[in-house]
């Protein structure tokens, strides 16, 4: 069983992989503005040990899944919109 820090780091690593993602994700990140929560998570994931968000993130365990779901939902929606646009052209 993972301790709290390991669990949160594993969520962060999985989310960071999503954010690094494939070419589509990179294009989506450039084209669409992400919500505030997602930007906070992105900032926290870039430098988790140095981030002012990481301590707060660790202290609110229930926030982890919410943030992960938010990131996943925003990227899924942005990718859908991007794919729709390229199909329309």
Write out the residue ranges for each language-model feature.
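A preference for well-ordered globular domain cores
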Residues: 1-89
């Amino acid at each position: 069983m993972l301790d709290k820090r390991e669990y949160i780091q594993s969520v962060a690593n999985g989310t960071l992989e999503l954010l690094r993602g494939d070419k589509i994700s990179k294009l989506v990140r450039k084209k669409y503005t992400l919500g505030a929560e997602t930007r906070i998570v992105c900032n926290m994931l870039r430098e988790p040990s140095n981030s002012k968000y990481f301590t707060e993130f660790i202290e609110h365990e229930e926030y982890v899944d919410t943030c992960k779901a938010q990131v996943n939902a925003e990227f899924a929606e942005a990718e859908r919109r991007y794919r729709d646009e390229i199909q329309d052209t």
